[in-house]
Amino acid sequence: MGLQLYQKNLLEKLKESLGAVLPIIGIVLVLCFSIAPIPNSVLMTFVVGAVLLIIGMMFFTLGAEMAMTPMGERIGTKLTNTRKISVVIVLCFILGFIITISEPDLQVLAEQVPSIPNYTLIIAVATGVGIFLVAAVLRMLFGIPLAHMLLILYPIIFILASIVPQDFLTVAFDSGGVTTGPMTVPFIMALGIGFSAVRSDKHAENDSFGLVALCSVGPILAVLLLGLLYHPGGSGYEQTMIVKTDNSVEMWQLFQEGLPYYIKEMLISLLPIILFFFIFQIVSLHLHKKTMVKIIIGIIYTYIGLVLFLTGVNVGFMPAGNYLGQVIAGLSYPWIIVPIGMLIGYFIVKAEPAVYVLTEQVEELTSGAISAKAMGMSLSIGVAFSLGLAMVRVLTGISILWFLLPGYAVALGLTFFVPKIFTAIAFDSGGVASGPMTATFLLPFSMGACEALGGNVVTDAFGVVAMVAMTPLITIQILGLIYQIQEQMKEKQAAKDYTSIKVCIENLDNVDNQEIIEL
């Protein structure tokens, strides 16, 4: 029975992975065989990378369900039950710090800013996440509305953004998405659910989300402050070198070189969380042996999934994305990159590993009121729109602030009109949508296009992650607005039906028995 259930779950996750990745493969293949021919070696590397990505997603989503989510929920619940604010603050800061410092994408971000020592940047960003994870948890425990905190923090961010060097803006805003990776997001979200589960008040459900939203603010503030302190002359960028292979053996060597690197990187990434959990298990949790075995198996699945996923996207997808961007932008009608970017953006967010975790948790926590399908559609529309705007930036060189400032103004304005839970989900969605697929396909695509057009890659191409993180804040809240209007219409209809029934009953009461007999 257990084996059959396991096979069923694995098959279900495989179907989800195929459904998420096949549209991207289809779009790339259509482009390759029509307006954007790419070398066979790059195409074959992309196809092999896609296979690894599908298998990796399958294992990751199953592993996150079995391990990362229950780990986060149990730690959150246990910390809340301690009733000791000092313990909660210290442990949440340590947790936020260690899961950020081990994020592989943070190392890449540090390399983009040579004016600041790598470890200075990494420690500053990790400290930012640690502080804001503490702030997010305290917000939940004391019932402080998320919108109030966001309305204070984002104006501060934009005031700082107006005085830092232009080259620094895109890297700073990208950092918010970079530090909320596929491994940390499910854990942090589950931590929030664990904290809110202990509360029994009516606002507990609304406060289940919002941790990722505030954790994304920390890195942006940290990088902007470092930009002011170090007065950097600009961030660094080296043109992407696309490795071409002459045969299948050379192509296989590319993956052989990439695989050990990601085996090591993901071990470093997962180890701090695993150690934290096992120490917590020994000292406080004392979970049953059967539960621990399931969690350990889930951790192994998560590890295998992330290794395969990251190898596939970095070795296979990154070169293809860069090359496609160069070829399409080099056409006599480069404007076509805007609708193509939107089409890719619409489908690629479905392949983000943490998106499935978010949509399923939202559907479960709202008892189906907010369906996974509606969430997925809203995210896809948001990312499509963001990619269109990002490609406009590549073509025109417009400053990212002209997009981010009105975008966040609209997002913050909507917080006054939509249900609170939608605001929290929306601001969490920004960090979830801007995952590894954005960093390894959309960003190289944007960089390739910028290189072909002769633009400034640092100011015009970087910032894609920030754009992808911004638009779901608007689309998810619009979904909330639609949901609210529908609920109000249902209530009005129910009230109308109740009034009609009441009138009928009163009329019947006025009919005497003789009239009833005659009838």
Each language-model region and where it sits:
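N-terminal alpha-helical transmembrane segments of multi-pass membrane transport
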Residues: 1-90, 94, 272-301, 308, ...
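Transmembrane helical segments that form the transport core of multi-pass membrane transport proteins
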Residues: 241-354
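Interfacial loop-to-helix junctions that mark the boundaries of transmembrane helices
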Residues: 11-17, 38-48, 80, 113-122, ...
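Juxtamembrane and boundary regions of transmembrane helices in multi-pass small-molecule transporters
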Residues: 3, 136-152, 166-167, 171, ...
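Transmembrane helix-loop junctions in multi-pass membrane proteins
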Residues: 30-44, 64-72, 98-113, 132-144, ...
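Helix-loop-helix junctions within the multi-pass membrane cores of secondary transporters/permeases
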Residues: 76-78, 85-156, 334-415
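Hydrophobic core segments of alpha-helical transmembrane domains in multi-pass membrane transport
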Residues: 22-35, 49-59, 91-98, 128-139, ...
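Intrinsically disordered, low-complexity non-transmembrane regions of multi-pass membrane transporters
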Residues: 1-17, 21, 72-86, 200-211, ...
